[in-house]
C-alpha cells in the first residue's frame, strides 16, 4: 500500500512538473511571438515616420507600446522608447496636450532610476518644444533649464550639445517678450565656441555669423552690425578674399540700409565687395549678381533712381558673359520686390497686452496699388476691409511709403499695375473704445533681400 501511494505521489509530481513546464513553454512561445510582432511594428513605425505619415504612425506606435507593456510590465525601462516615439508622433500632428502627457510619462520612468541621467535630455527638450508650441512659455523655460542643468552635469559647461537647448530657450523668451534673456542664450553660444575650438578658429566665425543673424531677426540693428564688424576684422586679418568676406560686407550694408540714415555707409561695403570680386580668379557670376542686386536695391531705397537703374542693368549685362544666367535674372526681375517695407499692425489696438485671446477676433483688409518704374507705389486703394475702416488709413499710409525694386524686361524697367496685398490681423471686439492709429512704424523684421 505504501509502495502504491509513493507511485501515485510520484506521478502527481511528474504531472505538476509537466504542466508547469508546458505553461512556461507556452509563455515563452507567446513572448517570442510578441517580440517578433513588436520588431515588425517598429520597422513599420520608422518607415511611416520617415515618410511624414504621422497620423498613421500614431496607431503603430500605440500598438508597440501596448505589446511592450505586455512583455515587460507597466514600469519597465523598455517602455521609454515606445513612449517617446508615440509622444513624437502626437507632437508632429499638433496634438501637444497628448504629447506633453506622454513625454512626462517617459521622463518619470527615466527619473525613477536616475534623475540626472543624460537619457533625460532628449525627452525634456521635446517636452519643452511642446510647451513652446502650445504657448506655455514659462513651463517651457523651466523644462529647458532642467535639460541644460543635466547637460552641464554630464558633459561640462562648454559642450556643443547644449547649443540646441539655448536656441529653444531663446524661442521661449521671445514668447515671453524677454529680449534680454533671449540675447543671453544666443550670445552665450559664442563663449561655448571660443572655449571649445579656440578663439582663432573659423568655427568662431560661424558662431559670430549666427549671432548677427539673431540680432538681425530681432531688429537689433546696431548689435548686429557690431558683431558683423568683428567678423569682418577676423576675415580680413586672415587675408581671406572669400565669398564669406563678401557676404559679411553685404550684411553690413544691409544693416545700414535698414537704418536708412547714411547712403554712403550703405553703399560703401557693396563697392568693396565688387572690388574683391574683381580680384577672384575663378569668378562666380551668380555672386556678382547678388552684389549688384543689393547695390540696386540700396540705391532704390534711398531714392537714387538713376544709380539704381545702372546697377540693375549691370545685372542684365551678366547674360552676355554667361547666357545660362538669363532664366535666373529674368525670374529675379519678373515682379516687384520690396526693398523698403513699412509695418502694418497685426493686432489692434496697438501696444495693448493680450490678456484674453477670446476677446479678439480675426480681421483682414486688401490693398490694391501700382508700382512705377521708379519703385514707388501709386494709385493705392483699399478694395475690402473687415471691420471697415479700422486699419484702412494706416494700411494706405504703409503701402504708399513702401518702395519696390520694379519689374524689368530685357534690362528695361516696367510699370506694374493692379497688385494686391491681403493683410490679416486680430482686433479686440470692443473696437469703438479705441481710435485708429495714424502713422505706421518701420517694420522690425528683415526686409526681402537677396542676402536675407
Locate predicted features:
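Sec/Tat signal peptide C-region and signal peptidase I cleavage site
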Residues: 22-26
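Charge-biased low-complexity segments
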Residues: 27, 33-54, 58, 74-80, ...
Amino acid at each position: 500500500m505504501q509502495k502504491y501511494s509513493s507511485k501515485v505521489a510520484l506521478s502527481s509530481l511528474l504531472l505538476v512538473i509537466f504542466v508547469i513546464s508546458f505553461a512556461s513553454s507556452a509563455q515563452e512561445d507567446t513572448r517570442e511571438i510578441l517580440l517578433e510582432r513588436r520588431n515588425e511594428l517598429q520597422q513599420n513605425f520608422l518607415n511611416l515616420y520617415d515618410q511624414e505619415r504621422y497620423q498613421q504612425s500614431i496607431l503603430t506606435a500605440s500598438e508597440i507600446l501596448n505589446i511592450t507593456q505586455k512583455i515587460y510590465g507597466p514600469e519597465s525601462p523598455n517602455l521609454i522608447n515606445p513612449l517617446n516615439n508615440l509622444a513624437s508622433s502626437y507632437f508632429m500632428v499638433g496634438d501637444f496636450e497628448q504629447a506633453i502627457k506622454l513625454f512626462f510619462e517617459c521622463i518619470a520612468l527615466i527619473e525613477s532610476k536616475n534623475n540626472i541621467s543624460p537619457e533625460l535630455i532628449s525627452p525634456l527638450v521635446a517636452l519643452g518644444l511642446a510647451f513652446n508650441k502650445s504657448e506655455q512659455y514659462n513651463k517651457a523655460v523651466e523644462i529647458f533649464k532642467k535639460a541644460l542643468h543635466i547637460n552641464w552635469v554630464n558633459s561640462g559647461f562648454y559642450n556643443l550639445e547644449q547649443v540646441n537647448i539655448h536656441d529653444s530657450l531663446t524661442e521661449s523668451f521671445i514668447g515671453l517678450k524677454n529680449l534680454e534673456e533671449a540675447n543671453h542664450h544666443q550670445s552665450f553660444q559664442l563663449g561655448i565656441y571660443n572655449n571649445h575650438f579656440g578663439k582663432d578658429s573659423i568655427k568662431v566665425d560661424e558662431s559670430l555669423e549666427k549671432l548677427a543673424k539673431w540680432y538681425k531677426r530681432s531688429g537689433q540693428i546696431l548689435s548686429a552690425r557690431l558683431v558683423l564688424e568683428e567678423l569682418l576684422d577676423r576675415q580680413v586679418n586672415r587675408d581671406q578674399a572669400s565669398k564669406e568676406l563678401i557676404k559679411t560686407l553685404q550684411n553690413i550694408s544691409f544693416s545700414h540700409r535698414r537704418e536708412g540714415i547714411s547712403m554712403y555707409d550703405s553703399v560703401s561695403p557693396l563697392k568693396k565687395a565688387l572690388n574683391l570680386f574683381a580680384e577672384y580668379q575663378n569668378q562666380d557670376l551668380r555672386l556678382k549678381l547678388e552684389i549688384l542686386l543689393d547695390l540696386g536695391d540700396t540705391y532704390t531705397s534711398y531714392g537714387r533712381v538713376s544709380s539704381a537703374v545702372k546697377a540693375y542693368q549691370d545685372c542684365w549685362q551678366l547674360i552676355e558673359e554667361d547666357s545660362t544666367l538669363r532664366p535666373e535674372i529674368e525670374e529675379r526681375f519678373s515682379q516687384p520686390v520690396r526693398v523698403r517695407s513699412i509695418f502694418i499692425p497685426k493686432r489692434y489696438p496697438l501696444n495693448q497686452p493680450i490678456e484674453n485671446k477670446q476677446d479678439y477676433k480675426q480681421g483682414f483688409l486688401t490693398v490694391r496699388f501700382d508700382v512705377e518704374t521708379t519703385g514707388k507705389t501709386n494709385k493705392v486703394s483699399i478694395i475690402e476691409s473687415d471691420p471697415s475702416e479700422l486699419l484702412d488709413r494706416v494700411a494706405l499710409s504703409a503701402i504708399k511709403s513702401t518702395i519696390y525694386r520694379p519689374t524689368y524686361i530685357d534690362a528695361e524697367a516696367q510699370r506694374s499695375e493692379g497688385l494686391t496685398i491681403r493683410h490679416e490681423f486680430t482686433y479686440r471686439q470692443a473696437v469703438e473704445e479705441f481710435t485708429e492709429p495714424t502713422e505706421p512704424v518701420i517694420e522690425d523684421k528683415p526686409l526681402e533681400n537677396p542676402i536675407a
